[in-house]
Amino acid sequence: MEAVIKVISSACKTYCGKTSPSKKEIGAMLSLLQKEGLLMSPSDLYSPGSWDPITAALSQRAMVLGKSGELKTWGLVLGALKAAREEQVTSEQAKFWLGLGGGRVSPPGPESIEKPATERRVDKGEEVGETTVQRDAKMAPEETATPKTVGTSCYHCGTAIGCNCATASAPPPPYVGSGLYPSLAGVGEQQGQGGDTPRGAEQPRAEPGHAGQAPGPALTDWARVREELASTGPPVVAMPVVIKTEGPAWTPLEPKLITRLADTVRTKGLRSPITMAEVEALMSSPLLPHDVTNLMRVILGPAPYALWMDAWGVQLQTVIAAATRDPRHPANGQGRGERTNLDRLKGLADGMVGNPQGQAALLRPGELVAITASALQAFREVARLAEPAGPWADITQGPSESFVDFANRLIKAVEGSDLPPTARAPVIIDCFRQKSQPDIQQLIRAAPSTLTTPGEIIKYVLDRQKTAPLTDQGIAAAMSSAIQPLVMAVVNRERDGQTGPGGRARGLCYTCGSPGHYQAQCPKKRKSGNSRERCQLCDGMGHNAKQCRRRDGNQGQRPGRGLSSGPWPVSEQPAVSLAMTMEHKDRPLVRVILTNTGSHPVKQRSVYITALLDSGADITIISEEDWPTDWPVVDTANPQIHGIGGGIPMRKSRDMIELGVINRDGSLERPLLLFPAVAMVRGSILGRDCLQGLGLRLTNLIGKATVLTVALHLAIPLKWKPDHTPVWIDQWPLPEGKLVALTQLVEKELQLGHIEPSLSCWNTPVFVIRKASGSYRLLHDLRAVNAKLVPFGAVQQGAPVLSALPRGWPLMVLDLKDCFFSIPLAEQDREAFAFTLPSVNNQAPARRFQWKVLPQGMTCSPTICQLVVGQVLEPLRLKHPSLRMLHYMDDLLLAASSHDGLEAAGEEVISTLERAGFTISPDKIQREPGVQYLGYKLGSTYVAPVGLVAEPRIATLWDVQKLVGSLQWLRPALGIPPRLMGPFYEQLRGSDPNEAREWNLDMKMAWREIVQLSTTAALERWDPALPLEGAVARCEQGAIGVLGQGLSTHPRPCLWLFSTQPTKAFTAWLEVLTLLITKLRASAVRTFGKEVDILLLPACFREDLPLPEGILLALKGFAGKIRSSDTPSIFDIARPLHVSLKVRVTDHPVPGPTVFTDASSSTHKGVVVWREGPRWEIKEIADSGASVQQLEARAVAMALLLWPTTPTNVVTDSAFVAKMLLKMGQEGVPSTAAAFILEDALSQRSAMAAVLHVRSHSEVPGFFTEGNDVADSQATFQAYPLREAKDLHTALHIGPRALSKACNISMQQAREVVQTCPHCNSAPALEAGVNPRGLGPLQIWQTDFTLEPRMAPRSWLAVTVDTASSAIVVTQHGRVTSVAAQHHWATAIAVLGRPKAIKTDNGSCFTSKSTREWLARWGIAHTTGIPGNSQGQAMVERANRLLKDKIRVLAEGDGFMKRIPTSKQGELLAKAMYALNHFERGENTKTPIQKHWRPTVLTEGPPVKIRIETGEWEKGWNVLVWGRGYAAVKNRDTDKVIWVPSRKVKPDITQKDEVTKKDEASPLFAGISDWAPWKGEQEGLQEEVASNKQERPGEDTLAANES
């Protein structure tokens, strides 16, 4: 045993690696197998014949006992045994065919492995399971090269000894491992001689000949290949061979070729062009199936190899299909011999399995070519799947990237993509036109049409670039080179403080701009006109502070300013492109006023400057010459501005600056708040941040730069409700991190001009959320404001159908950047969208802002966005009627009949939108190919959805709702049939969004089909030249329709339509198809603007002429063609069904048997009766859980199935069933339980059925009345006593107890009879009972809310009383809510402890979901009293009254006659609780607190009898508590305790032994001894015991007194 365990453990470590089982687990498994009798000895485990029985036995044991440890261990051991066995087989056969000794080993199979004679020790390098044959193989002479024989026949061909067979096959090793074929070590020099030279070397021409007569070919040097591959570690050591064109002879491959290919795959990947070239070179000659599979095992891993096998099989099936259609197909040998099949092509036919020589002899040349081509195509598919190519559609030419580098990247990505070779060149050329830089795009558009290859385009662009004229970019580059030395000199001097020789500056003068001197030495320096002017900086005369040398430094040149401490709070990345120099007359200059809003003292609050409008600058820059010297500045995160001339140092204003533009008439444009940059530039610049905020835009009209103001007529006023009083909701507190992020986002929006300071009386909260990228997003909670708005009506009824775009038209997609923020908000509405930016700990006054543009989250923003964009685009729609322009929110799609027309229209649309104030994202402009719009991918001929996940996460009802919504969006594009939507519709039942849902098997299977459908199905774009067709069909669980073209021949679907969910109990298929045809015609007009040209109807309508009335109504006004044909193949995915127009039910009698049906709710039975001769036959069904309507339907269904092939008349008194059955005259869709029952019965009938309705209990004589009475009597057979009770009550109106006794029915049935009486049911029938009390403290509490006006404003008091100890707990609340009740109970639990149960009324505060959850968490049971009946809460009601009286007395004693001051309410309430709980009440000798914390132990009192519902007295009870009108009794057998009225309790004098316990009873029962009936019973005790047969006389008297 130990030796076997050691051998198996070694084998498992070799072949299983880290997952190998331990020796202990192997020993336990072997012991179990021997115990179960599956192994006679441990060595039997080596026999393959025992493997299957062991596997079956362990699997059965795991399923029965749930223990799978031994089965898991056996799985690992079995894998190791099989791997060792396959290695042994391959090694033996390889040695055998190489002539190195060894014996014949059968092909792989459990029955052919030999039992090892010895076992090896892995640590000493011995063979695993080494057989005697293997040992002999090692001893065989090396020169042996002839095939071995078994018996008297050759193993190769089965002929006698001495045949000329030269070689045989070695099956490919099926297991992955680097240590395979250990017995072939050192065999490389012992291979057979005289074969062909290796492939890759110089090869002599082989003589053609038959395979069986050719000399033995030289096999590839396996040991040498193994040595070569040891470093790269290929998955399997195997050598492919090729077939020469001269004949079926093998040519060995050069091992270095295989090594190089394996290394190329490992380093370059499968999709590399080098890999593809080497694989195609190796497969340039026809290969055998044996060679193909071995080659793929070498270069592919296990998973890609499995994918390749599947893909190869698919390709071979295509070859077989072509060969089946054409008998003279090359694979069929030009019609000679048997046709090809899959077994032949895979080398699995007779004589080919594991025999490459047999494959070479039996396979035809055409088959070899097909095998090799299919294998190569499968390899390409696997390479695409295993290593997906990069997205070539996303490659664009960078701003500084050369065209050659861009072309290299693009061509490499396209060549490695999934595109077919014929489509790659057009795609590359099209990407050149769209993805290159704008100037190169213009060159390509101007290229001659004769340039049709990428190489020609590249050469043309390079040639044109050499001779291209000077462009704006070229001028800018030249200017940059010219002025860079000058600007950098200034920058270096400012940065390093360096000067030239002699102390002279190397920079420029700030006054005149000339180099060589400082500002102080400038000859053009302005002199002061007032010599007596006093400097405020140095107190000197003759100059002002601006000219003071102390300010400018030693030489008068301005040094760097003193910077305030602390970094700039807003993290920005300014990248400014300064405006190019213009002529002075064309420079767009404006007059600007700057106002400092800081709180520190400055000399000037406002200054006037002249600034240059520059739409190329990102931010606003104020020149240091214009910047007041006492306005502080701070450092920024980016200390430089980058422009054409290089970098310039910059700072930012520490205070917020108000900037306003002065118009020509002197008026001031709306001011803008911002933090401008301050730098050493010649003149101030207003950048895009300022232009957008002020509503200014720099445009170029007729070559002259002007300034335009965006018109405010685009602002659409909002509509407010009549009571739109201002809403003020305090800002939520935010943590410091989020507050900092909010501050940064607000400052950014302020600089962009989207918000402005506000003093509005409106306020709603703002907050931030973190995005997936790590940045924050600003959100504004506008729910309260939306409640005051009147929503606008929808202006766009859904999204456009993209398949309506004409087929082949080029497309362009535009994206409006920040569309909401580009549309102004009406000025009168802005104050309603104000918010507050708080500070931590209120360290500073809060800053308030309001939106100037459409805010996100406002209910009217989407509608206004659509209206404004549509208004801007309307003139273009009128100007270009043939242009297709799809507009949905901020996404635009343009389609034109030509590329030139599309480009022209696109430029016009972009310019129109930009003039209106919108921004187009250049990087989001899409052109074909690869256009995506509204979640769909559009090609020149198709429209396909994108974005389906592998498997969605489903946990709640809301998750299912979202998933169904997404599928509904995709259904018109994918054609998802109703049967696949059914499992998801089933999960939508419920009302709680958080209700748990699971991803069940039906949903999983349906989702798999939907995902598969999304990869294959797509809509086809409409071709206006072809007729538009429509078709409808019935399918599983509904009906389906489609609009398309060529539906009956080559279907091209354009839009899918589906029937709606049924809203009636039953809908006939004819009605469903009628509604679907109407919907199809309306969709065609709405989507394509035309009626359907051809309508395809199911074949049933061809057989039923004229058409049914419903179909004719649906076709009213239809002028197209109608065709009736079989269901088109496009509906196969929906599993179409035949539509039958046969009438199944009529309301006229038919010749055949007549049956009567009825059902009763009292007996819960349904019956069917019919007359057979003189007597009635009866059939019954019973179901206590079914309704009367379902019982009636089941009875009719049972009647219909009595004679399925015979016309039958069904008579029923149920109008509901009769009407429904008549509506089900034709096949249809049921939606209720009764309809499903009837439809199932009708579907099983083949004959006509007639349904006849009669009125029940009518006095009309005849056969129908008689049959109905018989059915009614059988259905209500057990209700005769109940009918008698009804009659007796109608006559005498007696009570339920009397009815129960008189008619022998239950009390429940008697109460139901009384309650159905309109005269006796004026008040609800209530049982006699008593309020349950606790037998001890903390068993039952009663809680109630009571109103005490003296305690206003918190005038609601929550009162809880312990029903056993009478202890009271009171809390004060402002409103009666669930939260108040939970808070009160938490306080009461802290004072008294946790109760077992609480009784309340049925108020919403006690019965809400949150309250139920709170009680469940505390483990407290909850019950409610009778609604509207205060007696159900008697104890707490008395406690309310007692508490209010105590509060009144205490308040009046303190001088508060009416309202108690708020400051005194808490103290007074505590005094009232103290007085009620800590002092005796009434006749009690203990206080409630004493009874609560020191309760009296109850003992059982005397035996009693109680009166039950039937009026009888039941024995076996003992008294526990006796009170005023109530008692608690305990059952002696079950220990059950119940509360009953005292009038239903009397002593049980028959229990003699128990009477003596009266004296030992608790004082609680002291009053019972004075009870008169008790005394009477005690005095007659002896007499009662003696006679024991005669009823005691006093009992009648007691009963009389009780009544």
Curated annotation (Swiss-Prot):
Region (Disordered): 100-150, 181-217, 544-571, 1551-1603
Site feature location: Involved in capsid protein dimerization upon acidification: D418, D430
Zinc finger feature spans (CCHC-type): 509-524
UniProt short sequence motif PPXY motif, positions renumbered to this chain: 172-175
Residues annotated to bind Mg(2+) 2: D1158, E1192, D1213, D1272
SUPFAM superfamilies: Acid proteases, DNA-binding domain of retroviral integrase, DNA/RNA polymerases, N-terminal Zn binding domain of HIV integrase, Retroviral matrix proteins, Retrovirus capsid dimerization domain-like, Retrovirus capsid protein, N-terminal core domain, Retrovirus zinc finger-like domains
Residues involved in Mg(2+) 1 binding: D815, D890, D891
Motif LYPX(n)L motif per UniProt: ranges: 180-184
Lineage: superkingdom: Viruses
Start and end residues, zinc fingers (Integrase-type): 1280-1321
Motif Nuclear export signal, chain ranges: 219-229
Binding site for Zn(2+): H1289, H1293, C1317, C1320
Annotated site residue numbers, Cleavage: 155-156, 166-167, 177-178, 239-240, 476-477, 479-480, 488-489, 577-578, 708-709, 1280-1281, 1567-1568
Integrase catalytic domain location: 1333-1496
Active-site residues, as the UniProt record annotates them: D614 (protease)
Domain RNase H type-1: 1149-1280
Job description of the protein: Capsid protein p27: Self-associates to form the irregular polyhedron core composed of hexamers and pentamers, that encapsulates the genomic RNA-nucleocapsid complex. Assembles as a tube in vitro. Binds to inositol hexakisphosphate (IP6), which allows the assembly of the polyhedral capsid.
Free-text comment about domains: Capsid protein p27: Proton-driven dimerization of the C-terminus facilitates capsid assembly.
Protein known as: Gag-Pol polyprotein
Organism: Avian leukosis virus (ALV)
